Amino acid sequence: MIPVTELRYFADTQPAYRILKPWWDVFTDYISIVMLMIAVFGGTLQVTQDKMICLPCKWVTKDSCNDSFRGWGASSPEPTYPNSTVLPTPDTGPTGIKYDLDRHQYNYVDAVCYENRLHWFAKYFPYLVLLHTLIFLACSNFWFKFPRTSSKLEHFVSILLKCFDSPWTTRALSETVVEESDPKPAFSKMNGSMDKKSSTVSEDVEATVPMLQRTKSRIEQGIVDRSETGVLDKKEGEQAKALFEKVKKFRTHVEEGDIVYRLYMRQTIIKVIKFFLIICYTVYYVHNIKFDVDCTVDIESLTGYRTYRCAHPLATLFKILASFYISLVIFYGLICMYTLWWMLRRSLKKYSFESIREESSYSDIPDVKNDFAFMLHLIDQYDPLYSKRFAVFLSEVSENKLRQLNLNNEWTLDKLRQRLTKNAQDKLELHLFMLSGIPDTVFDLLELEVLKLELIPDVTIPPSIAQLTGLKELWLYHTAAKIEAPALAFLRENLRALHIKFTDIKEIPLWIYSLKTLEELHLTGNLSAENNRYIVIDGLRELKRLKVLRLKSNLSKLPQVVTDVGVHLQKLSINNEGTKLIVLNSLKKMVNLTELELIRCDLERIPHSIFSLHNLQEIDLKDNNLKTIEEIISFQHLHRLTCLKLWYNHIAYIPIQIGNLTNLERLYLNRNKIEKIPTQLFYCRKLRYLDLSHNNLTLLPADIGLLQNLQNLAVTANRIEALPPELFQCRKLRALHLGNNVLQSLPSRVGELTNLTQIELRGNRLECLPVELGECPLLKRSGLVVEEDLFSTLPPEVKERLWRADKEQA
């Protein structure tokens, strides 16, 4: 038989699952153990003890055995003797009962009477108890074994225990009691002035962008509050980060269904039904457990008797055990009914962390549903502290704090200094790409002037940005940045340039329209939708000091607000990504414009409204599908125009009126289809930069020598066969790009270009280089772009001088 100490195995599940067992499951498990003990004890007795003890009955009346024999009287019926083959003599009194049966006959009679005459309930009582108990245990533990539920439960318990023991949980919960209040020393010096400014930041954002007064809350505008976090070591931080990812994936997976809830409900219903079934038939049949049993069997031919009186030795004990078993089943059933009532009364497929949100600083802990909610309800019956500690890993605020700590551990001050570079404007720049946030050490780079944030989700700009007193330029590329009120107050006074690139309107922080001192704004993204234009563009009216506006989008027409801010704009740049831009008459109002860029706007012709902008100094009409530029005659009214860019178009010829642009200093006509250069072009005597590369030119006119101020000439990728001698009269030439033409030779007069620093000759038909290249004192080997075999045709002393010039520069 099974030892009693091993019975617990049938009721115990994995030790880790104990936290999923409410008090009622614990009670029913122990009741099941007692039931098992009853079954094992009864079964053991039944196997080891005599099941039935039978004796033949000599005095039988109507197949019933009389307890004693009395003499026959006149009034007494005459007894019969079916069990005896020899009738007793009436006048001989009995002095005792003697049976002529041996031991084997008695054993046979016991077995036959036990099998045929003992009631089935008394016979199988221990086995019924064992069967019902095993069914109860199976119902209680099936959800721990069924693959579709056990996997979820195992995963849940594993994550829950790790969250409970995580150092991050303890630190996060401790912040709800004690908040760190010591600000950084460098920032504390500015608190006196910054606090006053930040107190009105939220109101100013709403005031400057009227549409926000109705639709945007303080949080939606990206203005948030912040508290300092503790410190974890790197290993603990990485472990906590992994836990956050596991919790996210587990929540997504478990909230999809409610199979755990439904299976637990069905288990409970089955146990309740089983309870009623057991009570009904057990109470009904328990009285059939009797000590005395009359047994009438047709075995007279084997034993000589037909009727026997039998004793069931275990009847009294079985009756006691049955009564005890019934009481246990009643207690078990009441618990199951309470469980069912608990499940039906409460909404167990929803779990709210409302109380935890009120007690802690993590007000963003979400409510959960379905199986996730049900398992948390079960955990609360075991110990509510588990849910409280687990909730920390459901909070995005908590995750952001942890992410910030890990980020600070990874990005030390020395590592950030190694990432500092000088940009084209010679400003000290830091580019952070695809990080989880902004490392706090960034704000210790006091020399920083330009900060680029790209693909950084949910970044929050802290007050410590005020330490960067030299910061004047901020880039937000696909970065939906929030900002704290003190930080916004600082940027309002100090930020001068802002670059924003977005694909979704939500990536544009609305607080940018409160930057009163902003002078330069670059917006790159889709503004074709009407609501996008309204939200993004409309706020520009409040940027009164804006001088430079760059829009890279796909507008169909110039928004009215651009015209409104254009009164004080000095530079307007629109890159329309190939979408046709129409209705440009409003440009006339931008009287203060000095630079205008209309790139990829599919204009086809030069807009007439440009000619009214008398302060224009630079015009860029790149890639606009221009085929003719006859309107260029009107440019003569733009007396301040010094730079004209008509590159990347389909221009076939240059109008002779180009000569009227006498103040022109830079002219870009590259990437067109020009075949001839008019003489009038060389009347622009102030030209310093002329780019005619990638056209269809076959020669350069001799009048090019009139451009005495020319410093850079580019005619790369044409079909020029020879260079006019007059070209070398342009003594100020510093760069000469002649690559990919069909030049047969390079004139020796090239040595007269004493200011030449770069000459490109690659891709021509030259056989040798003139020795006079050595007479260009500023020319170096790196500035001579030519095939290596062609370079080898120069005399050794010339090559040596060119190489030496490179080394001296290095």
Swiss-Prot record:
Catalytic activity: chloride(in) = chloride(out); iodide(out) = iodide(in); taurine(out) = taurine(in); L-aspartate(out) = L-aspartate(in)
An example Gene Ontology molecular-function term: cyclic-GMP-AMP transmembrane transporter activity
Modes of activity regulation: Inhibited by (4-[(2-butyl-6,7-dichloro-2-cyclopentyl-2,3-dihydro-1-oxo-1H-inden-5-yl)oxy]butanoic acid), which plugs the channel like a cork in a bottle by binding in the extracellular selectivity filter and sterically occluding ion conduction. Lipids may block conduction in closed heterohexameric channels.
Topological domains, Cytoplasmic: 1-22, 143-264, 342-810
Site (Required for anion selectivity): R103
Keywords noted in UniProt: Acetylation, Cell membrane, Differentiation, Disulfide bond, Glycoprotein, Ion channel, Ion transport, Leucine-rich repeat, Lysosome, Membrane, Phosphoprotein, Repeat, Spermatogenesis, Transmembrane, Transmembrane helix, Transport
Modified residues (Phosphoserine): S202, S217
Listed transmembrane segments: 23-47, 124-142, 265-286, 317-341
GO-annotated cellular components: cell surface; cytoplasm; lysosomal membrane; membrane; monoatomic ion channel complex; plasma membrane
Motif Di-leucine motif: where in chain: 706-707
Gene3D superfamilies: Ribonuclease Inhibitor
Location of Phosphothreonine modifications: T200, T215
One GO BP: intracellular glucose homeostasis
Record: glycosylation sites: N66, N83
LRR repeats: 399-422, 423-445, 447-468, 469-492, 493-515, 518-542, 543-565, 567-589, 590-613, 614-637, 639-661, 662-684, 686-707, 708-730, 732-753, 754-776, 778-801
Record's comment on post-translational modification: N-glycosylated.
Purpose: Essential component of the volume-regulated anion channel (VRAC, also named VSOAC channel), an anion channel required to maintain a constant cell volume in response to extracellular or intracellular osmotic changes. The VRAC channel conducts iodide better than chloride and can also conduct organic osmolytes like taurine. Mediates efflux of amino acids, such as aspartate and glutamate, in response to osmotic stress.
Family: Belongs to the LRRC8 family.
Name used for this protein in its record: Volume-regulated anion channel subunit LRRC8A
Organism: Rattus norvegicus
